[in-house]
Every structure is written in structure tokens, then in C-alpha cells.
């Protein structure tokens, strides 16, 4: 599924929210909907406020930063809360967030962060190091609070706040992600009142107290998320007064809304299809952005769902536990055809786990290791594995029954459906049946392990630790009744050992080499088969948005950034202000902060490494 996208692992307590939200498709008054015969222009509300409306295909899994993993949700949290550090929109290196500087002890086991004194919560209270210490300590001591981002604090020994502007984190072992802790810092005076972090979704009382560039003011499940500009944000107030994320189940309807001016921006599901993008090319007042993406698009195979306590659950097909079968299936997937016929060139053929946008970590299998497209060899593998065809040309399992695999498919993603039809053809030629289960809610069967294969995808951060952690044994649920951070129930000792090594390695080149070994291991296991690296294809109205920052500055995406840069920097088209929306202007602000850091003699021991071009 995917996002950190991060787009998966919905806590069981959220299922009722998701199910109830599926029926709530009517927007509040003031928002354009298919039921509104006279939808308002997105660029300005009736009261003169400048509103930026973003059409999205994904629904919110939770508005709690302790639970959310979907790309939309984590993107909203980047707007609501500051993180200790941020990613530079130009090249992804670490820049100040809530922390103005940071340094480590010689042994790299103690990290000290200076917390800025000019960040306030939206209720007027000062944001301090105590808020950060409380956030991390809560994640360290409460399993519910560790649901989404627990991997970041698993190696923490102690976190303290000696003063309002000083945060100290002591580690058990060296940890290479200390300037890449993608954890929203929340206000202690608000969140310490929460009794059950595994159930609290932060979606009942508005406005929600935060200290980011926007304040959450309204939400309706599967309808909209509304935020207003934080006029006291320390980096400067956004130029738009309001930001609205509006849910569209039908992406053609979202594209139509963009044409009519009912929305300012459309992201697609998770990108525009080639046909949608082509239909917008050359349209008046519409700009299409087509850039290398930070996502991978994969087929995940059920490895036999199990919990940390060793108990198995779910009903994945037993034949998929044979690596020869998994390899045969992938060798029967024509990835070039997927790029050409489904993505129509708006993607790169997939192999390794991390997209080529992040060159430091990009890995490709060797010629002898690669599972190249070879249907004949795939058939031979299945024969050798004992899954031969019967008289009707159908492959049969050990139970003598014809094999048909259930493939989980996102109902809102046209790529899933298109690739699924090809799988029915390609695997059908092997004698294997395919049943596409295209659902609005794939979370329930996924968490229950009731699938054979599934379309999967995650947005990768400049520091890839999170997307690596979701395949460790430690990410499994504690029991079959619990929810873990796991993506696909993979648990492999060799992979776990490599994960621990990369996390403790501060040398960038050495760490990158270990990460590539992890990708190689994941590839060989055959449970996560990457088919493509889709481009970020999106569009916006130039008569509503004058300028907006892409990330990275050159050939970057707008939606789903590792930061708040796009929506914070966006300048309304009818605004006389030209200082806040360009990438150059944003970089200038960052550069000023870095000059201050250098003047203070800060030593940054570890930085987020950028890819050649650039969750949740």
C-alpha cells in the first residue's frame, strides 16, 4: 500500500473511523462539490480570503502524528508541527527546524539540540525543549505513541530538557539518523491529557494547537481537511490565508475541477495518469509538473503473516512461501511494458527498493542476480517447484486445487487496475489465476494478513531509515490483535543485522554501502518486487498560484514534499508579493539560517544526504 506514501498500517482502532468516513462524502458549505451547481472559485472565498485548494485521492488515516503513516496525513503534520530539523528544499541537507543547531559528543552517543526561542504554539504558549523531550519520552514508554515513528526512538537511552532551549538525547549505540528524526514535536500541555494514544485521532476539537506554518481548523473524513495560515510562524506567515485538501474518489472529477477553477492544484492517485496529464497540457492557465518521483511501485507478497509472539494469522497462499514461486511470478512481469503501456514513459523501470532520485542509496541487481523478464524460465521454475499444470492447463497447488492468487488493489488507483489486467494475462499464460480485489479500504485485509499479493508503494525520505525499518522483525505487531509498523510482515535475521549496522554507521559512504546490501537482500527474498519508480505528475492553475517551490529546486515535486516548502511558499496569482513563492526565495531564507549556524560555530556531524535530483 504505501507513507509514508507512507500509506499503510492503519491502527485497528482507526478502522471504524475509516469505515464511517467512507460514507461521509458531502463537503461542508463553502466547499465546491459535485452536488453544488455553482461551485466557488478556489482562489478566493466570499470573505476575500485567499484559499489554496488541493485535490487529493488519498484519505486521512489519522490526524494524530503518533498514528498516521499515509502520505496525506504526514504531509499535513509537517504543516501543523515543527520537527527538530528540516530538509533543505534545494538539495535535502539538514537545516534548522525547531532546533537552531545541534552537536554530538565525541563518541556520538549524546546529542544536544538548541531549541529556538521564537516558536510559539498557536494558543500563545512558548514551544520549548520540554515539549520535544516529552514527545520522545512518550514514544519511548507508550506503545500506542510509538505506532508510526517508534523506530526513531528505539535506540534512545534517555531524553531530557535541562532548559527551555536545550534538548539532550542520550543513545544506547551510535545512530546515523539524529539529524533526520522525522517526528512531529507536539505541545505537552495539550497532549499530556490524552489517555489512550492508540485510539486518539486528534480530529474532534478545532483548532488544533500547533506551531507549524498552518493551523488545522476543520476536518471531515473522506471530504476535506482545512487549515489556516499561522500568522506568527517563526519563518514567516504563508501567503495564502487558507489551505484546503479536498478528497476526490474519482480523479477524472478532480481534473475536471481543476479545469473549472474549483481547485487550485491536483495531485492524482498518487500522480496524474498519462491521459489526465496529456489532457491538461497546453490548457489555459494550467501548468503540468512532471518530475522524477520519490516513490517506488511494487508487488508485495504475503510471507505468512505473524506477530512478535510467534503466532501466525491470515491466509496467504502457501505456495508463495517457496522462493522459486515468488521469483517465477516476478520473472513473468514485463516491467518495460508497464512503463510503456501503463505509465506511458512517466516512470522508470524498477528493480531496487530505493528510487534513482536518491543516488547515494540507489541499487541495481547484478546481471547474474537480476530476475529479468523470461516467461519460459518462469514456467520452468514453477515446474521444478512442483506446481505443474493439470489437463486443463491450470497450475495446481499441493492440495491438488488450481492456483488463483488474490491481489489487493487500490480502487482509486487506475495504475493498479491496469497492471492487474496485465498480471491476469501474464500469469494466466503460466497457468495461474489472478483475482483482483480492488477495494476502497485495503487496510483491513492487509492488517489481517488476508491477501496473497498486493500493490504497494512508499514515498522515500532523503534519509531512508523509515522505509528500511518497516521490513524488520521489530516492526511486526506484538500479537495478531495488535498493529505494528510493518509493511508486509517480512522478518529476516540477515536483513535485521544489516539494518542495525546501517543505523549505527556515521560514515555516509559506508552506510550507503550497507543500505545497498539491504536492498540486495530484500530483492533476493522476493517478497517486495519493485516494478517502477513513477514520476510525480501533478498540475496547478497559474491564475490562482503565481509561484510555488518544488523540491528539489531542479526537477522536483510539489505535493508530498519532505517539508512544508510548497504550500508555505505559494504566492497567490493576484498578489503583488513576489518574494515568497520561488525556490530561490525559500533557499535564501534557508541560507540565512545556515549563515547564523556557521557564525555560531555549529558542527553538524551527520547530514541528510541528497540524491542526484532531490515519508509518509
Q: How does the language model describe each region?
A:
Residues 25-27, 36, 44, 220, ...:
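Detector for C-terminal structural segments
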Residues 53, 128-135, 168-170, 212-213, ...:
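Alpha-helical secondary-structure segments
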Residues 55-106, 137, 207-209:
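N-terminal lobe/hinge region of extracytoplasmic solute-binding protein
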Residues 56-77, 98-100, 125, 178-186, ...:
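A structural "hinge/loop" feature
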Residues 100-145, 168, 245, 254-257, ...:
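Aromatic- and charge-enriched surface segment that lines or borders ligand/interaction sites
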Residues 114, 148-194:
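Surface-exposed binding/hinge segments that line
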Residues 146-149, 158-159, 217-228, 244-312, ...:
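Extracellular/periplasmic solute-recognition and catalytic clefts
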Residues 183-238, 242, 375-376, 380, ...:
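Gly/Pro-rich hinge or "lid" segments in bacterial periplasmic/extracellular proteins
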Amino acid at each position: 500500500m504505501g507513507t509514508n506514501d507512507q500509506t499503510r498500517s492503519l491502527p485497528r482502532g482507526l478502522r471504524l473511523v475509516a469505515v464511517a468516513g467512507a460514507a461521509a462524502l458531502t463537503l461542508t458549505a463553502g466547499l465546491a462539490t459535485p452536488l453544488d451547481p455553482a461551485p466557488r472559485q478556489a482562489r478566493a472565498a466570499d470573505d476575500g480570503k485567499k484559499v489554496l485548494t488541493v485535490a487529493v485521492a488519498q484519505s486521512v488515516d489519522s490526524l494524530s502524528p503518533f498514528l498516521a503513516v499515509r502520505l496525506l496525513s504526514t504531509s499535513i503534520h509537517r504543516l501543523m508541527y515543527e520537527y527538530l530539523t528540516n530538509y533543505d528544499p534545494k538539495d535535502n541537507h539538514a537545516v534548522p527546524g525547531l532546533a537552531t543547531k545541534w552537536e554530538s559528543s565525541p563518541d556520538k552517543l549524546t546529542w544536544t539540540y538548541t531549541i529556538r526561542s521564537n516558536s510559539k504554539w498557536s494558543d500563545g504558549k512558548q514551544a520549548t525543549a520540554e515539549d520535544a523531550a516529552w514527545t520522545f519520552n512518550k514514544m519511548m514508554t507508550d506503545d500506542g505513541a510509538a505506532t508510526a515513528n517508534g523506530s526513531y526512538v528505539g535506540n534512545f537511552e534517555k531524553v531530557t530538557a535541562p532548559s527551555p532551549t536545550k534538548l539532550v538525547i542520550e543513545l544506547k549505540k551510535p545512530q546515523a539518523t539524529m539529524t533526520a528524526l522525522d517526528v512531529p514535536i507536539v505541545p505537552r500541555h495539550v497532549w499530556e491529557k490524552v489517555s489512550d494514544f492508540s485510539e486518539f485521532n486528534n480530529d474532534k476539537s478545532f483548532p488544533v494547537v500547533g506551531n507549524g506554518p498552518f493551523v488545522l481548523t476543520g476536518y471531515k473524513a473522506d471530504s476535506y481537511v482545512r487549515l489556516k495560515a499561522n500568522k506568527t510562524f517563526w519563518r514567516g506567515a504563508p501567503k495564502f490565508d487558507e489551505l484546503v485538501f479536498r478528497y476526490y474518489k474519482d480523479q477524472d472529477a478532480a481534473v475536471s475541477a481543476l479545469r473549472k477553477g474549483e481547485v487550485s492544484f491536483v495531485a492524482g492517485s498518487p500522480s496524474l495518469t498519462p491521459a489526465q496529464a496529456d489532457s491538461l497540457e497546453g490548457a489555459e492557465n494550467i501548468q503540468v509538473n512532471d518530475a522524477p518521483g520519490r516513490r517506488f511501485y511494487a508487488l508485495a507478497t504475503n510471507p505468512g503473516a505473524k506477530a512478535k509472539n510467534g503466532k501466525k494469522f491470515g491466509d496467504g497462499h502457501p505456495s508463495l512461501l517457496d522462493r522459486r514461486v515468488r521469483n517465477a511470478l516476478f520473472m513473468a512481469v514485463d516491467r518495460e511494458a508497464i512503463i510503456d503501456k501503463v505509465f506511458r514513459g512517466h516512470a522508470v523501470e524498477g528493480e531496487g527498493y530505493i528510487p534513482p532520485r536518491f543516488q547515494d542509496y540507489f541499487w541495481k541487481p547484478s546481471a547474474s542476480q537480476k530476475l529479468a523478464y523470461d516467461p519460459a524460465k518462469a514456467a520452468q521454475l514453477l515446474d521444478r517447484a512442483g506446481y505443474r499444470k493439470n489437463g486443463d492447463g491450470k497450475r495446481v497447488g499441493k492440495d491438488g486445487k488450481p492456483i488463483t492468487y488474490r491481489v489487493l488493489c487500490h480502487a482509486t488507483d487506475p495504475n493498479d487496475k491496469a497492471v492487474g489486467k496485465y498480471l491476469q494475462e501474464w500469469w494466466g499464460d503460466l497457468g495461474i489465476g489472478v483475482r483482483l480485489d480492488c477495494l476502497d479500504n485495503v487496510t483491513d485485509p492487509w492488517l489481517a494478513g488476508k491477501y496473497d499479493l498486493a500493490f504497494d508503494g512508499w514515498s522515500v525520505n532523503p534519509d531512508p531509515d523509515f522505509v528500511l525499518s518497516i521490513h524488520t522483525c521489530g516492526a511486526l505487531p506484538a500479537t495478531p490483535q495488535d498493529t505494528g509498523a510493518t509493511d508486509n510482515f517480512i522478518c529476516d535475521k540477515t536483513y535485521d543485522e544489516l539494518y542495525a549496522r546501517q543505523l549505527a554507521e556515521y560514515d555516509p559512504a559506508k552506510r550507503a554501502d550497507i543500505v545497498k546490501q539491504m536492498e540486495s537482500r530484500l530483492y533476493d527474498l522476493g517478497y517486495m518486487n519493485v516494478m517502477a519508480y513513477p514520476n510525480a505528475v501533478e498540475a496547478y492553475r497559474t491564475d490562482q498560484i503565481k509561484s510555488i517551490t518544488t523540491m528539489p529546486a531542479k526537477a522536483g515535486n510539489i505535493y508530498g514534499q519532505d517539508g512544508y516548502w510548497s504550500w508555505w511558499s505559494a504566492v497567490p496569482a493576484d498578489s503583488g508579493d513576489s518574494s515568497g513563492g520561488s525556490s530561490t526565495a525559500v533557499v535564501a531564507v534557508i541560507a540565512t539560517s545556515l549563515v547564523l549556524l556557521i557564525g555560531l560555530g555549529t558542527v553538524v556531524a551527520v547530514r541528510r544526504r541528497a540524491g542526484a535530483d532531490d515519508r509518509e
